[in-house]
């Protein structure tokens, strides 16, 4: 079986350029009307794209370490996803450089943190920026190395050679450590007096769910367009669907564990995160988050035929 190349039609390119222009225009208008919202939205988008790029590298590393040959047919998809890291990384670093004062703690002086002196030290603007650059450079370097080794496997008899396994193992440790710290630095630090020891694994569960969903959608589109029509089977779709179902339940488990422990302890430093998110207009958003990330995936993907039907 040979992989077919995807040819992009001029009409599709034109529509893509129009969509890009509209998005840029909306961003520019929002930046004038409501700068804080525009920069905040751009930051969230950049962070989400970074998690997808990291998820592609994570998928390559995990399948390499586990010797999962079944993913060879669509391995180019997670490889391509790692290409999001440089672009999204530049956007995120730009937002941090230009809009760091958007973080509430930025305006406070030295000593305002009181007993939380370590947070004051950890969130120093220069230290925060240095860590952000370090995370992104490290991720890009590992992602490129993983992709390069993944593509050289096409000419080798052994689908998972030892050098690729070693690189993947090192990346898994680096990934687990850095994604947890990045989640604290970039998202959790928006509310610096709030803390949760489960935030890192909560970020990971969302990352892996988004990655699997992106891989599934991309593979379905590429199978319909031709490049994966001869190699991507219903069995692959079934296996990816099982993974998505499993990690959807894992996400719900982590979400409930975090919420239940904070609700039961009823400590102000912890409840300050959930109280505004369960009241007013944010209440339906919280419910929608659960419905979209667990309720719908659970009941839709539970039957076997649904996992095999694109």
Question: Model-predicted segments: where are they?
Answer:
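Juxtamembrane helix-break-helix junctions at the cytosolic face
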Residues: 64-70, 300-310
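Transmembrane-helix bundle segments that line or gate the permeation/cavity pathway
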Residues: 46-155, 171
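Core segments of transmembrane alpha-helices
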Residues: 291-297
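Alpha-helical transmembrane segments of multipass membrane proteins
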Residues: 28-29, 61, 183, 298
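N-terminal regions that are enriched for targeting/export leaders
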Residues: 1-55, 120
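Long, contiguous internal "core" modules enriched in hydrophobic/ aromatic residues
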Residues: 7-27, 122-289, 302-306
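Hydrophobic/aromatic residues in alpha-helical transmembrane segments
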Residues: 54-58, 210, 249, 296
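Membrane-interface helix-loop junction between the first two transmembrane segments
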Residues: 30-43, 62-71, 221
């Amino acid at each position: 079986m040979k992989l077919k190349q995807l040819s992009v039609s001029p009409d599709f390119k034109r529509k893509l350029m129009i969509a890009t222009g509209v998005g840029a225009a909306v961003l520019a208008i929002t930046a004038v009307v409501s700068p804080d919202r525009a920069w905040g939205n751009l930051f969230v988008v950049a962070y989400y794209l970074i998690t997808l790029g990291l998820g592609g590298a994570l998928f390559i590393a995990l399948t390499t370490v586990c010797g999962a040959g079944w993913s060879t047919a669509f391995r180019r998809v997670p490889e391509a996803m790692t290409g999001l890291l440089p672009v999204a990384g530049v956007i995120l670093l730009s937002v941090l450089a230009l809009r760091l004062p958007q973080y509430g703690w930025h305006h406070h002086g030295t000593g305002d943190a009181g007993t939380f002196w370590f947070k004051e030290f950890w969130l120093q603007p220069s230290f925060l920026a240095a860590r952000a650059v370090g995370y992104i450079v490290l991720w890009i370097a590992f992602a490129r190395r993983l992709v390069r080794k993944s593509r050289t496997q096409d000419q080798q008899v052994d689908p998972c050679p030892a050098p690729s396994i070693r690189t993947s193992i090192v990346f898994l440790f680096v990934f687990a450590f850095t994604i947890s710290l990045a989640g604290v630095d970039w998202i959790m630090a928006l509310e610096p007096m709030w803390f949760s020891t489960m935030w890192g694994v909560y970020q990971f569960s969302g990352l892996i769910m988004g990655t699997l969903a992106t891989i599934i959608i991309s593979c379905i589109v590429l199978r319909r367009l031709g490049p994966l029509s001869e190699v991507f089977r219903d069995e692959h779709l079934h296996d990816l669907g099982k993974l998505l179902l499993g990690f959807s339940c894992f996400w719900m488990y982590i979400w409930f564990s975090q919420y239940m422990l904070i609700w039961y302890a009823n400590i102000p430093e912890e409840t300050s995160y959930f109280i505004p998110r369960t009241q007013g207009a944010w209440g339906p958003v919280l419910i929608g988050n659960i419905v979209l990330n667990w309720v719908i995936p659970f009941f839709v993907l539970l039957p076997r035929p649904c996992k095999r039907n694109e």
